[in-house]
Amino acid sequence: MSIPETQKGVIFYENGGELQYKDIPVPKPKANELLINVKYSGVCHTDLHAWKGDWPLPTKLPLVGGHEGAGVVVAMGENVKGWNIGDFAGIKWLNGSCMSCEYCELSNESNCPDADLSGYTHDGSFQQYATADAVQAARIPKGTDLAEVAPILCAGVTVYKALKSADLKAGDWVAISGACGGLGSLAIQYAKAMGYRVLGIDTGAEKAKLFKELGGEYFVDYAVSKDLIKEIVDATNGGAHGVINVSVSEFAIEQSTNYVRSNGTVVLVGLPRDAKCKSDVFTQVVKSVSIVGSYVGNRADTREALDFFARGLVHAPIKIVGLSELADVYDKMVKGEIVGRYVVDTSK
C-alpha cells in the first residue's frame, strides 16, 4: 500500500492560535504503533480545550488535535501483533500507557501517570494519517460505517463508563445534565439500552425534540422550569437514582447534588474550567449520596460500548463537514450551537 510523504491536517503552533489547514508530514509508526489512514474524526469539547490550552495539563506544541478517529490500518511497527493491514481501527483519547504501573495493572490505564493522550500530548486524528499504540487502538468490526462509529470512540465510551460508575439497576431513573449535546445524546441511548428510565436536562425546542426521538422519557428545560430541583424530584418520584453530569456548568453540578435521591450517585464527567463541586455536607451524609468522577473507559469499556453500537442499540446523531471546516465547528462550540456530534471528513 502506497503511503504519501505529506497529508492534509489541521495544526496549531500556539494555544489559541490559528487553526491551519495545510500539508504536513505523514508520521512514521514506532515499533509498537499502528499507522491509521483516518477517514473520519468526531469533534469533542476536549479538542476545544486542547486548542485553547485552558486546562492545567499542558499540551504538546505544535499540535494536531482530535481523538475520535476511525480509519484503516495501513502500516505497523515491527513489534505489533494481532493486527493486519486493512483492519478497521479507532484512535481514542488514551493513545498509550505504560502498562506496568498499579493503575494499568488494574485496567485503569487512563489514570496512568505516563498516559499518552491523542490530540493533546500525541498528534491526533485531525489529519489523514495518525499513529496509535497497537494495544490501546480500538478494534472496529469490518463493514462498520466509520463516520457513524467515530464519536463512539470517545463520547460513547465516556458516557457508557459513566453510566456503569453510577451503579444503577434496570428501572432506575438516571438524569442526564446536558442531555442533547455530543455526550448527552449518546448517554440517553446507552441508558435506555441498559434498562434505565431517562430524564434529560437541557434547553430549547430542538433539543427537547431530539431527546424524545432518542428515547428519553422526561425533559426538563432549565431555562423554563420554575423550580428545576422540585420538578425533577417529582418526575422521578423522589429523585434520580443516578445523575450523569456531562454539561460544563458548575451551577448545574451543584444542582444535581440536590435532586439525586438518597443512596444515589452523582457522576462528574464534564470539565468546567476552574469549577468546584459544591455539596451540602449535612445533606450528602444524611442522604448517603455518592459523588464520583468518571474519566474515559478502559479497553473492556471500549469493546462493550462498540458492541452496543454494532448491535444497533445506539447511534450518534452526526453532522459531517470537511476537515477544512474545523475552525467553524470550534466557533459553534464556543457559542453553544452544537446539537448532537460533528464529524469531520478528512478527505475534504
Curated annotation (Swiss-Prot):
Compartments (UniProt record): Cytoplasm
Positions that bind Zn(2+) 1: C44, H67, C154
A Pfam family reported for this protein in Swiss-Prot or TrEMBL: ADH_N
EC number: 1.1.1.1
EC top class named in words: oxidoreductase
Cofactor notes: Binds 2 Zn(2+) ions per subunit.
Listed InterPro entries: ADH-like_C, ADH-like_N, ADH_Zn_CS, GroES-like_sf, NAD(P)-bd_dom_sf, PKS_ER
Signal sequence, renumbered to the chain: none
Xref: PROSITE patterns: ADH_ZINC (PS00059)
Domain of life according to the entry: Eukaryota
GO MF annotations in UniProt: alcohol dehydrogenase (NAD+) activity; zinc ion binding
Residues given in the record as NAD(+) binding sites: G178, A179, C180, G181, G182, L183, G184, D202, K207, V269, G270, L271, R341
Record-level GO cellular component terms: cytoplasm
Record field: catalytic activity: a primary alcohol + NAD(+) = an aldehyde + NADH + H(+); a secondary alcohol + NAD(+) = a ketone + NADH + H(+)
Cofactor(s) listed in the protein's UniProt record: Zn(2+)
Residues annotated as binding Zn(2+) 2: C98, C101, C104, C112
SMART domains recorded: PKS_ER
Keywords: Cytoplasm, Metal-binding, NAD, Oxidoreductase, Zinc
Subunit structure: Homotetramer.
Family statement drawn from the similarity comment of this UniProt entry: Belongs to the zinc-containing alcohol dehydrogenase family.
Designated name of the protein: Alcohol dehydrogenase 2
Species of provenance: Kluyveromyces lactis (strain ATCC 8585 / CBS 2359 / DSM 70799 / NBRC 1267 / NRRL Y-1140 / WM37) (Yeast)
Name of the gene: ADH2
